[in-house]
Amino acid sequence: RDRSPSRGLGDVYKRQEDGSTSTREIVHHHGGACILPVDADGNITLVRQFRYAFGEEIWELPAGKLEAGEDPFEAAKRELSEECGLTADKYTSLGEFYPTVGYDTEIIYTWVATGLHETRMHLDADEFLTPDRVPLAQAYEMVMRGEIKDGKTIAGVLKLKALLDEGKL
């Protein structure tokens, strides 16, 4: 197996407190950008996409992988346009998080998009998804019932709801 960083997998050797060493395989990832589109009525746009790893259609926030050196904010705006056919007047950062801290260097950068305007979707040739506007309260209930299983979507919906409930957004 190729372990070069350009292929995404590398070994890390760590000296333990007792003097021994351990080896960890680390996946090197350029990161991702995630966007929470919120319309004037308080609906968020989720996408439904078949995920082969789980053999089912998954509810997700629009998101995508970053290319090497790509600005996360520009990637988030691109995903909003490509996956939802939307642009926005205002973007508010919700920060970043590490989705898989045990073996992966991925950081997901997250924004809320408001002042939405419809444009045209531009899906990749191998991308098949359906956007759907859902009231935030319904998305929250979907998280709580386990209908939304995607980690970035769970984190985004819960953080957005908390910030709105606290009047911080």
What are these regions (language model features)?
Residues 1-9, 13:
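Single conserved hydrophobic/aromatic residue that forms the stacking wall/gate
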Residues 43, 117-119, 167:
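Short helix-loop capping/hinge motifs at secondary-structure junctions, enriched
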Residues 10-11, 57, 107-109:
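Short beta-strand micro-motifs in enzyme catalytic cores
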Residues 140-169:
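Long hydrophobic alpha-helical segments typical of transmembrane helices together
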Residues 33-34, 65-151:
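Unchanged
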